Amino acid sequence: MENNNSLTIIKKADPKTKSNGEAFQIAFDSMDKIKTMLTQQNDKEKLVLKKLMIEMSINNSLLNELLTSFSTRVNIIDVEIIVLESQISTIERLTLENKKEIQSNDQEKIKEISSMIDKLIDPLLKNIDGLTNKFTEKNVNDEELKKKIDVFFENSKKLFQGIDKAEKSQFLTKFSSLFGVISGFLGIGSVTAIGATEAVGVTSLIAVGATSLSVVAPICAPVLLTFGCLVGAFISFYKQSVARDKKLKTLKSLLSYYMENIELISQVTDETTKLIYHELKEKVLEFKKLEANLKIDFDLSPIKDQFKSITSKQNLIKDKVEEIANYQLDLIQECQKLKKKSLKNKTINKK
């Protein structure tokens, strides 16, 4: 099985550890950070975040599709589990009813019982394989969903490229500010610090306004005063540039959270289920091998416990995905409120 980050997270969330919810803690932590960003930024910064959030609202429908796809599979698995539990109960009853004959070493009886158990175990193994296939098989809807996820990642890459370009443009702003100090000091005219506007991929990422620095050194003005004013202007421009750098890094971080969440949710259900059924099959095969050699007391409780683990993990995943989807919806609604507030402010300003 492919060893990726999601699978590593799932293995950490093994039933042997204290918590089964570790796989989704990353998603919740990142969502908390997003909400904090929305509540702590000033209005202009909120609008920048709002634009990105609105453009990424496709995530919500993506999450819902993932949830629907998973729920459909879970319903199929629930039915199959009932059948498997029935088979296990039959094997358990058969072994208990014939325990005395087995212990008495009645070879004919043992052979007869082993044959009956084999006839029950073989379909059990087949059903486990079928169960895994039903959960992981690809259908038309899955392929469409995969295409949407691929488009999301492609758009995200374009956004990152836009952020990188905007970050590089900060160098121009700093350089032009420095050049403004020098040219102003020499009294040779004025210079404009050029801002950067990036519109790449699915969103207009960030617009850095154009700021003009016009300094003409008066012939009669003291040189020292002129230089002091220019240095002050340069410091102001530099601070603005640093603030923009910080904002761009915040946006890049926010986009990373989204990408991690979608990747985690789209992989964690399949990978978790594969892991569970692989362990289950190993236990049944081990049981069959020991049963053939009559070296165990026909205790099927570990396998039954494994089914309980499957059910609880399925419910955990389902609940967490629903919770994340609702959380995402709350964030989008908060962004829409910001958008309405922005439009209202624009209307007031026009008046």
From Swiss-Prot:
<protein>
    <recommendedName>
        <fullName>Transmembrane protein DDB_G0272716</fullName>
    </recommendedName>
</protein>
<keyword id="KW-0812">Transmembrane</keyword>
<feature type="transmembrane region" description="Helical">
    <location>
        <begin position="175"/>
        <end position="195"/>
    </location>
</feature>
<feature type="glycosylation site" description="N-linked (GlcNAc...) asparagine">
    <location>
        <position position="345"/>
    </location>
</feature>
<feature type="glycosylation site" description="N-linked (GlcNAc...) asparagine">
    <location>
        <position position="59"/>
    </location>
</feature>
<keyword id="KW-0472">Membrane</keyword>
<keyword id="KW-0325">Glycoprotein</keyword>
<feature type="transmembrane region" description="Helical">
    <location>
        <begin position="215"/>
        <end position="235"/>
    </location>
</feature>
<keyword id="KW-1133">Transmembrane helix</keyword>
<feature type="glycosylation site" description="N-linked (GlcNAc...) asparagine">
    <location>
        <position position="4"/>
    </location>
</feature>
<dbReference type="GO" id="GO:0016020">
    <property type="term" value="C:membrane"/>
</dbReference>
